[in-house]
Amino acid sequence: MSSLKGHPKGLYLIFATSTAERFSYYGMRAIFILFLTQALLFDKEAAASIYGSYTGLVYLTPLIGGYIADKYWGIRRSVFWGAVMMAVGQFLMFMSASSLNNTDLAHWLMYGGLGFMILGNGCFKPTVSSLVGQLYEPGDKRLDAAYTIFYMGVNVGSFAAPLICGFLGDTGNPQDFKWGFLASGIMTLFTVVLFETQKNKYLFSPSGEPIGIVPDARREKKEDKAEHISHPKMDKRTKVRNIIIITALTVALIAFFSYAFSDDWISVGIFTACIVFPVLILLDGSLTKVE
């Protein structure tokens, strides 16, 4: 397998992909609160609520995104579609900042952009780092250094983004925020193009097998089947029972948190999802004891 300075070349593809994605994320965040208060003219309390809800959901959705990648999509598909959704979100933010003369449109574009970025981050964030470990044999002494290199990319993107996007967007003129969002959008688009065009060239296991295509759970079950290890299955009655449990739990939590938080529907959604998502995953009868 091709290598560079003692590491698989796939590591440097993951490094570049993560650097670009973290640039787009932290670049947008660096100017977002200023955009809300100076361009969209939200008061500080409302702006802080939107910003806090966005960042909270960004850290919540990887829970379900990782589950989907592990069970259904596989890592490559999750990374690709996560980056695509984030790119759409960043360009919607650019369009929002370009539509300040139409306040309602600017608000809707902003909320749409946040939604796409939240969903995209949920798919991308928990999966891209897991590719690193699959490039090496278990117990490989280079693995610690590989993760150090990977997180160097994360830190480089996180450090450079506020400087560049802040310089472009925070000029004192509300019309200029769009340039900061555009820079973030371009970097996210670069993430999509880079990963999609290079993944088949560099992402291979030490044995030469492509990594990240088959969902981990499906691959592990095939291996266990070959070794005659059985896994539990859900029958239709169990599936119906689980649907009823999740529905009843969701309705009950929404009612409770609606009473507790009054009209703050974003907090209601976050707190409800924090409980429902783990329960949904735990009710999956196909989970193994290890999972």
Where in this protein do the model-derived segments appear?
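Central cavity-lining transmembrane alpha-helices of secondary-active solute carriers
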Residues: 52-71, 87, 125, 159-161
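Intracellular loop-helix junctions on the cytosolic face of multi-pass helical membrane proteins
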Residues: 1-9, 138, 166-291
